[in-house]
Regions:
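N-terminal regulatory/sensing modules of transcriptional regulators
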Residues: 1-90
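Short polybasic/polar patches that bind polyanions
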Residues: 21, 123, 141
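The DNA-recognition helices of helix-turn-helix-type DNA-binding domains
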Residues: 23, 128, 139-140
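Helix-turn-helix DNA-binding segment
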Residues: 90-133
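Residues within the DNA-recognition helix of helix-turn-helix
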Residues: 134-138
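Basic, Lys/Arg-enriched C-terminal extension of HTH/homeodomain DNA-binding domains
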Residues: 141-156
């Protein structure tokens, strides 16, 4: 199981890292970088996603088709609550949905979290702007959201 932490609040991030000291925590802002776009996540890997309210929808969209449990970072109080959620929580696994590739995840995360424009993402990743737009479109299409802007993933 991999634990991924997604929040814009650095204080909350630091507190959650201290709370999860027995797990190896991956920070989403450091994981979804253009350098990591060639990484291939294992198909049977489980992900514990801890995100704030603003980025919850984005993370759910990015991990659709994978085995994951998503928790709201603002509602967590102690490590016992986290371990209870891991053992008794409802793990999401939609085998019918196609999982996003790492390149699609990197583009969607960069577009929403870092608020980078497609031309900036294209230059960082060494690809064309049309390819970035294709990644955004196919990422949304794999979630059944045809013709919907990626910016709609921000919010509760």
């Amino acid at each position: 199981m991999k634990v991924i932490l997604t929040t814009r609040n650095r204080y909350l991030e630091y507190g959650l890292q201290a709370l999860l000291k027995e797990h190896s925590v991956i920070l989403a802002r450091e994981f979804f970088l253009p350098e990591n776009r060639r990484y291939i996540p294992d198909f049977d890997e489980s992900w514990l996603i801890i995100s704030d309210g603003l980025l919850g929808r984005l993370m759910r969209c990015m991990f659709q088709g994978r085995h994951f449990l998503q928790l709201d970072a603002e509602l967590l109080r102690d490590d016992e609550q986290i371990s209870d959620a891991i053992h008794n929580g409802v793990w999401t696994y939609n085998s019918a949905a196609r999982p996003l590739t790492m390149s699609e995840m990197v583009v969607m995360f960069g577009y929403v979290y870092r608020q980078s424009r497609p031309c900036r993402l294209a230059s960082e990743m060494g690809i064309h702007t049309k390819t970035v737009n294709t990644f955004l479109y196919t990422g949304m299409a794999k979630n059944g959201l045809y013709g919907v802007s990626v910016r709609r993933l921000v919010g509760a």
